[in-house]
Amino acid sequence: TPAPKESEMAAVTVPDETIAVNSPVYSFSEKSSLLWPVEGDIILGYNMDKTIYFPTLDIYRCNPAVVISAEAGEPVLSSAPGVVEEIYTDNEIGTAVKVSVGDGYEVIYGQLSNLQVGVSEHIEAGRVIGYATEPTKYYSKEGTNVYFKLLKEGAAVDPMLYLIEK
């Protein structure tokens, strides 16, 4: 069969939009639960109403996250399914991964090394995202730990309200 002549071809207009095909939609709410990223104990609890003592810094201040004890090299697991939004390095919390878990909620994991995820990657709950590493100088007296922060629309939320009881 001969190829159609240009005059016989139909014009097709494609809108200037990127359509995400088969991209999961994540949902998180006040009724959702989070898996513990590591098995350790809480070293420094969440408190935005009162100050708590930070041994290394020798100061009292609010804490927008929880700091969970860990062993160096221990796998750090994703607490919920989501998409990796950002990977960055912070003087206080070291290498960190921010994961959007849906409906304006984000989880930040800090004090990581040997990351196993990349930006824009979709991850399931329980997936290894990295490994606990020696703490930054801001947490040297607290020891090796994982910094674990939950945000809703950019504001810190107490992750203990969502973590599944051990």
Positions of PLM-derived features:
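Polar/charged, compositionally biased leader and regulatory segments
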Residues: 1-53, 60
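Short, flexible surface segments
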Residues: 38, 72, 80-81, 93, ...
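Residue-level recognition of beta-strand microenvironments
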Residues: 45, 87-88, 115, 132-135
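Short alpha-helix capping/helix-loop boundary micro-motifs
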Residues: 69, 114-117
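Zn2+-dependent peptidoglycan hydrolase active-site motif and core
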Residues: 78-113
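Conserved, short, structured surface segments that act as functional micro-motifs
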Residues: 121-166
